[in-house]
């Protein structure tokens, strides 16, 4: 077999392949044997029908098509291996010559990972915001802790923000009741508009036994996107009484004896959380700084596929109703043109970062280990609020374990850039990134999290190893 590669543009190649007919003869023999096993002709035992009779009955062209269609994928794979081309899209195959007794010729056009010239990461200088813990930050954390131990007491006054209410709800559209929209005795914390848009505004000022009608746009069911008249009735009003922030409270909720010790500990927790937030900003800033120094050609097919996915996801929640989609966009003060422009821009940004990090991972010869995958599995499960084993099962059943490997590899690529670059805050202080991005920090955190959550059995470890390979 002979193959050659033409570079059509920085992200697309054409592979020309020629396969001598003699190389296809074993494929023909297998095709004849397989066909003969399923054909019954008078005078011949199963599997013993001569090739010439099979050709006469089914046509040589039919057999040729079958052999060629089965042969091209493996020959394409062989051509990729020989040329070291790294495809990132679906191949487009065109048969140039296909005649019995003659060499097979076909071409494959496919999008490939572009070549990117990387700078010396140690020359990157990045500035981010400093970590600052204020008294207000600590007080907010303390209020949250006090709220967890608060007591709900009934009050005889109108509803205010922060109250807990028991309510009844019903909805109508054009005077007709919306099926399955009624609710009785529903508990709701006013000011945390998680139920229905406009509900909190309607509740404030009502007393127990009073009702109010307001208009809102339904977000689910077959009526999604339609305006509905909602009636809310307040059944009861309660407020949360917070415990006093004294030494007794500190002893109740922690291992500390005094409020001063508890406040100091809360300050440490806030500081750690802010350092973690700063680490994410450092991660993004490192990639942005690198992007300013490199040129990343974009494969249009990959960008288009990501754009199509975004559009599909937006429409699927509305039953692919274009009119409803237009209404929802109009309510947000947007339009289809603006949505598509933003979606394409996001797709281009995501693909650019993905391609860059893949090249960095190759350049740094990054290998993904089991601990890295365990960490990503646990972090992703926490992000979506699901059990790690359930997430693993979902990824395995949907053949998406490789996406976990890719994600882990790209994060390690960012860590390599961060470790080499210099980071300072806007006050001029050098930032030590080793806690979150050092070589040992990655595996140490993975070991710790794995021990805490234990999401992996031996069977899971084996499959994770296979995915990494």
UniProtKB/Swiss-Prot annotation:
Alphabetical list of PROSITE patterns matching this protein: FKBP_PPIASE
Localization (cell): Cytoplasm
Major site of localization recorded for this protein: cytoplasm
Statement: the UniProt record of this protein carries the keyword Cell division: yes
Keywords, alphabetical: Cell cycle, Cell division, Chaperone, Cytoplasm, Isomerase, Rotamase
Record-level GO BP terms: 'de novo' cotranslational protein folding; cell division; chaperone-mediated protein folding; protein transport; protein unfolding
Domain PPIase FKBP-type residues, every copy: 162-243
Basic and acidic residues bias (residue ranges): 437-452
Keyword presence, RNA-binding: no
EC assignment: 5.2.1.8
Disordered: region residues: 429-469
InterPro entries: PPIase_dom_sf (IPR046357), PPIase_FKBP_dom (IPR001179), Trig_fac (IPR005215), Trigger_fac_C (IPR008880), Trigger_fac_C_sf (IPR037041), Trigger_fac_ribosome-bd_bac (IPR008881), Trigger_fac_ribosome-bd_sf (IPR036611), Trigger_fact/SurA_dom_sf (IPR027304)
Entry's Gene Ontology cellular component terms: cytoplasm
Function text: Involved in protein export. Acts as a chaperone by maintaining the newly synthesized protein in an open conformation. Functions as a peptidyl-prolyl cis-trans isomerase.
Listed NCBIfam families: tig
Protein name per Swiss-Prot or TrEMBL: Trigger factor
Species of the source: Mycobacterium leprae (strain TN)
Gene: tig
